[in-house]
Amino acid sequence: MKKILAFLLIAAGSTLFFVFLFIFLSKVFSGEILLSRYIFRIGGFELRWYSTLILMGFLISYFVARKRAKNEGINLEEFDELIFYGVIAGIVGARLYYVLFNLKYYRSLWDALKIWEGGLAIHGAVIGALLTGFLYVRLKKPSFTFLQATDLFTSVLPLGQAIGRWGNFFNYEAFGVPTNLPWKMFVPEPYRPVVYKDYSFFHPTFLYESIWDLLVFFMLSVYFKRYRKRHGEVTCLYFVLYSLGRIVIERLRVDSLMIGNIKAAQLLSAVLILLGFTGFLILRSSQEPKRAF
């Protein structure tokens, strides 16, 4: 009886939440409600939605990953230490990647350090975290392998990404080209690119990626628990699945980081798909024991 009651309460709460979210989004997307970047501002102190949602995404992902690490028999003190270093490297990598592609917009080092205002790139974060994880495992010799750690990391990363993308929503960024589709999103003129200043409605690409990230999280979670044979397989699948969605969605975005005439995210995603697919085939065909990886 208690289980049934708990299920009904969760179902009712979830239904109310999604109804509220639908109504709220419909009003924002139509332009009836204009968003603020700030949760509140008191004097010189301000709390932004962007940084809050990034932090929320990290914390939820961290606790899910920690539970999985415990089930894997991993020393949790070592795991927490790796996460600490990985987060620092991830933030530095995410910001550095973004700033390097937008140097002309940063007049000083202080401007480049204002990560709470937005401007983090997931590819830079992943590169920074993976490099740090590799060095940590090589130097500290913990109770887990590098690929075991990356599997834990990438199995929950899409969940954090799905939540963090809503920070772009409140910043009116990471949207796509103009559209007249029923789910079009109103963007105030100050946030529109100059070439699209006469358009009012755009593709909500932040929402597309958030939904895709959530789907990737569920797919990787199922694979992690039921089908994984070798450490590293989940990491390879993350590279493939996330990158497939990113390549498609990036085609619509108007604020992409560029390498010449090529969108950097699409180029790097194509490389990750190739590496991930190749790595997955090698790992699945290997006869070595799981621990070797």
UniProtKB/Swiss-Prot annotation:
It is a multi-pass membrane protein. The chain crosses the membrane at residues 45-65, 81-101, 115-135, 144-164, 204-224, 231-249, 262-282. GO terms for biological process: lipoprotein biosynthetic process. Its EC number is 2.5.1.145. One of its GO terms (cellular component) is plasma membrane. Pathway: Protein modification; lipoprotein biosynthesis (diacylglyceryl transfer). GO terms for molecular function: phosphatidylglycerol-prolipoprotein diacylglyceryl transferase activity. It is found in: Cell inner membrane. Keywords: Cell inner membrane, Cell membrane, Membrane, Transferase, Transmembrane, Transmembrane helix. Signal peptide: none annotated. It is an enzyme of class 2 (transferase). InterPro entries: Lgt (IPR001640). A 1,2-diacyl-sn-glycero-3-phospho-(1'-sn-glycerol) binds at residue 165. Belongs to the Lgt family. HAMAP family: Lgt (MF_01147). NCBIfam families: lgt (TIGR00544). PANTHER family: PHOSPHATIDYLGLYCEROL--PROLIPOPROTEIN DIACYLGLYCERYL TRANSFERASE (PTHR30589:SF0), PROLIPOPROTEIN DIACYLGLYCERYL TRANSFERASE (PTHR30589). This is Phosphatidylglycerol--prolipoprotein diacylglyceryl transferase. The lineage of its organism: Bacteria, Thermotogati, Thermotogota, Thermotogae, Thermotogales.
